[in-house]
């Protein structure tokens, strides 16, 4: 038998195949013709069984990509192998008598199986870098295990191309990626080919629907070491995923939702990263490069690695664009500085902390030069936009919160442009917050706004006294803010020393009351009376109070005391007993007025006065009773005979036999929405109303030290009696109830001072049902 069409490297053919070929040569006079009639480009394993027979050609599966990516010398060997098998000639018809067609088919199949398996082993090593597995098992082109004899893999360059055909749709790509990451999660070591998803198409894929929840959890599973170069993620959702050591070069992430997505140790160069506006939490970049990548103006770049920019042109985006450099990154800018553009790009206080200002500033301090250069380009753009003061006004706070801090203060260009902006910002703060409380200072405000205000007061020292309401608030928050730096506190303390030395302030601090009692503030305790507010109307009037008192009066609770301060006139302490808090705040210290009124409207004691003293029948008394609730002490007394008689005429019908009439009791329940309330809730309300009327009858309001209006005393006792009937459990004890009752009427030798009774009842209510008391008792009496 002749074997034609070139020599074969028989060193690669098993011994048994050699013997079979020798047998053919010796015993066959007539050869058989066998053809390879088809080479399929399928995913079938290279070691599938061959279909053989005398009249049937040998048919085997060979992926086209394997043929394409063989090295030239291997392609030649492959072609020779195919040609050799094809040209085994039927040269001796006598051979048909000696060897059956079945044996010949088996010999041919064994020859081809062995040679192709060896070539596949070469391919696996070159394509994936994988050495042959133990026991003659290797990984075929479609990543399925195949059995072959172990060979030493040849040394050849490693390629990152896949041997299988590419998926045809985003869904197929997603399925393939899911399979790969799950294998990685299971602990399998993936080859470079397994992790190669270059040129993939993931458009419109929501990854939370294809990955297990563990990939979206905090500190959950990680997608590690994958190659997504030149891939499309447009309109996909990769939120909460963590990509580590991944490559996204030249990929498109336009309108991708990447809320809280983490990119770490990754290559994101030359990427279009204009993620969707629906992204709620910014993605993070940790030790990641973004060279020539187009970034939205609301990104956080705190972990990015910057490099020197090259001479690349700005990226091309649909609709055109304007860009500035931030190191080697491209930041998108508006084409025109319209009102919407100013708000969207600059107002992070209105956009959940996101703006181009915060994006630039988010870089680490080691990139100060790049940050300043980018901010200078931004300022040049704003200056070129010829924006009016009215247009800049809504973003003044955002601008100064960033640009008034280092390293930008080192730039003459930025400082020159920012100066007028900061002055207008400060003037607006003085106008707005001298008479109302500052917003509760969060971390942002403490670290970015308070230092700017300190600097502004330092430049405009006269404002410390003309706007002492704002100035004292700023110092208060600087000294108490947990996120304020030591530098901020030190500067605040130094400024306050200047304030205390001012001629309008110094007369009020040398009275043995201020601070550490020698005229200096004591910042070691919040109980020290360190703060001194000047009256907005009278320079001789001032209010001295502690840190804790000032904080609670600016942000009150129902239990806030509104008289825990010193009122000073010409430096001397004066009594506030007969001063209405609301009038004091309205006239002299308006910074407290809004908070006081807000608490006052929640007190509903006046509703009972309107029931008893209707404005139509008793207009004058109604006003007297309501006015008395606005101050701790009243100069109006109702103990003369005419007043006593008039009050008796009004209250006696409500108290037949000294108890509340059923009709009047129902009126009270209706006024306070207690008709369906529990007996205990009704009793607590009546108890607090009794406390208030006890105060009316005391020497503080309508009584004196020796006398009090009997009708008011009797009405207070009747309210308390009804509360006892409804729920004795709300009282300290039956003995205490009896003692209070005796004191109202002077029975059994009890001391009849209703002021003592009112104070005692008030303390009990504040301890056991404070919310009910706070909803009824007038603020001035609290």
Curated annotation (Swiss-Prot):
Ubiquitinated in the presence of host E1 ubiquitin-activating enzyme, E2 ubiquitin-conjugating enzyme and ubiquitin. Residues 137-171 are annotated as: Disordered. Its EC number is 2.3.2.26. Keywords: Secreted, Transferase, Ubl conjugation, Ubl conjugation pathway, Virulence. Residues 157-171 have a biased composition (Low complexity). InterPro entries: SopA-like_cat, SopA-like_catalytic_sf, SopA-like_central. Belongs to the SopA E3 ligase family. This is E3 ubiquitin-protein ligase SopA. It comes from Salmonella newport (strain SL254). The gene is sopA.
């Amino acid at each position: 038998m002749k074997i034609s069409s070139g020599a074969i490297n028989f060193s690669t053919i098993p011994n048994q195949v050699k013997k079979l070929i020798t047998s053919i040569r010796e015993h066959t006079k007539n050869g058989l013709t066998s053809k390879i009639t088809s080479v399929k480009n399928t995913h079938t394993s290279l070691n599938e069984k061959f279909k053989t027979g005398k009249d049937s050609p040998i048919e085997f599966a060979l992926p086209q990509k394997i043929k394409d990516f063989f090295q030239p010398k291997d392609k030649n060997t492959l072609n020779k192998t195919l040609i050799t098998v094809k040209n085994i000639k039927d040269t001796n018809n006598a051979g048909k008598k000696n060897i059956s067609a079945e044996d010949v088919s088996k010999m041919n199949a064994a020859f081809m199986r062995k040679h192709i398996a060896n070539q596949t082993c070469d391919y696996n090593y070159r394509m994936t870098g994988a050495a042959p597995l133990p026991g003659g098992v290797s990984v075929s082109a479609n990543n399925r295990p195949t059995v072959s004899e172990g060979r030493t893999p040849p040394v050849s360059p490693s390629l990152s191309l896949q041997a299988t055909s590419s998926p045809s749709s985003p869904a197929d790509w997603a399925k393939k990626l899911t399979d790969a990451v799950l294998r990685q999660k299971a602990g399998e070591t993936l080859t470079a080919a397994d992790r190669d998803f270059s040129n993939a198409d993931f458009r419109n894929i929501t990854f939370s629907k294809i990955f297990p929840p563990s990939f979206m959890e905090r500190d959950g599973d990680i997608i590690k070491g994958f190659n997504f170069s030149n891939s499309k993620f447009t309109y996909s959702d990769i939120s909460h995923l963590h990509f580590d050591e991944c490559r996204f070069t030249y990929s498109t992430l336009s309108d991708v939702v990447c809320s809280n997505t983490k990119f770490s140790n990754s290559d994101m160069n030359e990427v279009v990263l204009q993620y969707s506006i629906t992204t709620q939490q910014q993605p993070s970049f940790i030790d990641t490069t973004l060279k020539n990548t187009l970034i939205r103006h609301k990104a956080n770049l705190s972990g990015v690695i910057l490099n020197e920019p090259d001479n690349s042109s700005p990226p091309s985006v649909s609709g055109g664009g304007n860009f500035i450099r931030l190191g080697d990154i491209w930041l998108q800018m508006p084409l025109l500085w319209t009102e919407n553009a100013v708000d969207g790009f600059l107002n992070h206080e209105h956009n959940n902390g996101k703006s181009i200002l915060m994006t630039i500033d988010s870089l680490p301090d080691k990139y100060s030069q790049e940050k300043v250069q980018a901010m200078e380009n931004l300022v040049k753009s704003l200056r070129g936009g010829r924006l009016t003061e009215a247009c800049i006004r809504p973003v003044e706070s955002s601008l100064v919160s960033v640009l008034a801090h280092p390293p930008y203060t080192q730039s003459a260009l930025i400082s020159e442009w920012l100066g007028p902006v900061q002055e207008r910002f400060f003037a607006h703060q003085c106008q707005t917050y001298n008479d109302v409380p500052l917003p509760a200072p969060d971390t942002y405000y403490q670290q970015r706004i308070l230092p700017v205000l300190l600097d502004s007061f330092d430049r405009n020292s006269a404002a410390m006294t003309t706007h002492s309401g704002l100035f004292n608030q700023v110092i208060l928050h600087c000294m108490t803010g947990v996120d304020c730096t030591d530098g901020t506190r030190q500067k605040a303390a130094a400024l306050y020393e200047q304030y205390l030395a001012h001629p309008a302030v110094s007369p009020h601090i040398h009275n043995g009351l201020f601070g550490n009692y020698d005229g200096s503030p004591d910042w070691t305790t919040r109980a020290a009376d360190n703060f001194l507010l000047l009256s907005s109307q009278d320079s001789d009037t001032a209010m001295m109070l502690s840190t804790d008192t000032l904080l609670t009066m600016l942000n009150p609770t129902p239990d806030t005391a509104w008289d825990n301060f010193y009122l000073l006139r010409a430096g001397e302490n004066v009594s506030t007993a007969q001063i209405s808090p609301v009038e004091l705040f309205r006239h002299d210290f308006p910074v407290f007025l809004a908070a006081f009124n807000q608490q006052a409207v929640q007190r509903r004691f006046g509703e009972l006065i309107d029931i008893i003293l209707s404005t139509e029948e008793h207009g004058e008394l109604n006003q007297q009773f309501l006015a008395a609730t606005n101050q701790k002490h009243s100069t109006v007394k109702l103990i003369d005979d005419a007043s006593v008689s008039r009050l008796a005429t009004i209250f006696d019908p409500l108290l037949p036999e000294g108890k509340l009439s059923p009709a009047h009791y129902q009126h009270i329940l209706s006024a306070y929405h207690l008709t369906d309330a529990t007996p205990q809730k009704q009793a607590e309300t009546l108890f607090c109303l009794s406390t208030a009327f006890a105060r009316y009858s005391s020497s503080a309001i309508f009584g004196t030290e020796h006398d009090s209006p009997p009708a008011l005393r009797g009405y207070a006792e009747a309210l308390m009696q009804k509360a006892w009937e409804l729920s004795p459990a709300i009282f300290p004890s039956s003995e205490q109830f009896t003692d209070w009752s005796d004191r109202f009427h002077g029975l059994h030798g009890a001391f009849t001072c209703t002021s003592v009774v009112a104070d005692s009842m008030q303390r009990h209510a504040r301890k056991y049902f404070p919310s009910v008391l706070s909803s009824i008792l007038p603020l001035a009496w609290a």
